[in-house]
Swiss-Prot record:
It comes from Streptococcus thermophilus (strain ATCC BAA-491 / LMD-9). Keywords: ATP-binding, Chaperone, Metal-binding, Nucleotide-binding, Zinc. Transmembrane segments: none annotated. Pfam families: AAA_2, ClpB_D2-small, zf-C4_ClpX. InterPro entries: AAA+_ATPase, ATP-dep_Clp_protease_ClpX, ATPase_AAA_core, Clp_ATPase_C, Clp_protease_ATP-bd_su_ClpX, ClpX_bact, P-loop_NTPase, Znf_CppX_C4. One of its GO terms (biological process) is cell division. This is ATP-dependent Clp protease ATP-binding subunit ClpX. The gene is clpX.
Amino acid sequence: MAGNRNEEMVYCSFCGKNQEEVKKIIAGNGVFICNECVALSQEIIREETAEEVLADLAETPKPKELLDILNNYVVGQDRVKRALAVAVYNHYKRINFTESREDNDVDLQKSNILMIGPTGSGKTYLAQTLARSLNVPFAIADATSLTEAGYVGEDVENILLKLIQAADFNIERAERGIIYVDEIDKIAKKGENVSITRDVSGEGVQQALLKIIEGTVASVPPQGGRKHPNQEMIQIDTKNILFIVGGAFDGIEDIVKQRLGEKIIGFGQNNKAIDDESSYMKEIVAEDIQKFGLIPEFIGRLPVLAALEQLTVDDLVRILTEPRNALVKQYQTLLSYDGVELEFDQDALEAIASKAIERKTGARGLRSIIEEVMMDVMFEIPSLEDVTKVRITKEAVDGKAAPVLETA
C-alpha cells in the first residue's frame, strides 16, 4: 500500500515539495506547480514590474520639455501650461525621491491640480496631452455621476477601476497614473451652511473623493458597480496617482468681484482695472473656491490652482490651424485621400470660431461646426472625379452658399 501511495504522490516541478507539504498543486502538461511557487512567481513579477515603472518615471521630461510638448498640441493658456508642466514634473520627481530615499525626514506632498475654466477652454485636452506625453495610464471621470456609498449612482472607487483598465490591469502602472475628474464644480455644496439633510451629490462625494485623492489603499470591485460582501476586490494604493480636477465654476467671478470690491471699500484704494471675466479668473484664490461650495479639506488637497481663460476668436482660429492635429489639417488629409485639396478662407475660419463662441461650446464645438459645413462636400466628392479643390468661404459657414468646387 505504501509503495502505491508513493507512486501516486505528486511533487512540485520547481521546489520538489509533495502535495502533502503544500496547500495546493496545479497540474499542467506533464508539469506541476505548488501554490507557494505561484505566490513567489507573482512577487518576482510584481517587483520587476515596479522597477520597470520606476525606470520609466526616471525619464520624466523636464518642465520646459513638457511645455514644448503641450505647445505642439494646445494653443494659448500659457500660464496654465507652465503651471501644469511644473506640477507634473514635481509629482513624478516626488515618486522617484520617495521610492529611492533612505531617510524618512521629509514627506513630500502630492501636487494635485485644480483647473478652473469655461466649457471648451481645454481642461480635459490638457490633461489628456500630459498623460500621453508621459506614457502613463489615464482615466477620465465625471463628478456628476458620483454619489456617496449607499446611494444610487457610481461609487468613487469606480474611478480607480477606469485607471486600472487603462493600465491593462497592471496595478503598479495604475498606481502611477493620472486621473482627471471633470465637472467638479457640480458637486459643490449648495451653500456654506451645513445641511441637516443628506447631501447625496455634494459634500458627501467631496469627502469620498478626498480619501482617494490624498492617498489610501482602496478596494475596487473588478467588474465595477457596487461592492458586495463576498466579492473579490482589487487593492490599489492611490498615494502616487496624480489627480487633476476641473470645472467651469460658473458664477465664481461674481465671488471674486465681491471680494475685490470689499477691499476697495475697506481701504479706499483704487483697484487695478479688471474689465473682463478672464481677468477675474486670474484673481481666484482658495477662499473664493470655498465660498463657491468646495470644502476646505478638499481644496487643501489640490495645491496647484490653474485658471484657464475664455478663448477668443483669434485663439479658436489658431486651434483650428496650428496644432499638429489641428482640425483643418485633419480634414485636408481626409480629402487628400480622394485627390482633392481643401482650403479655408480666413474669414471662414473666423466665422467658425465666432459660431463656437456664440454657442458657448469653445474649442470642443469646432468639429461639429466644420462637420455641418463639410457634410455635403464629403458626401459628393468621392463621386466627382473632376474636382481638384474645395474652398470653404464665410458664406458657406453662414449657410448662405455652398462651398466652392474647382475642377481641373
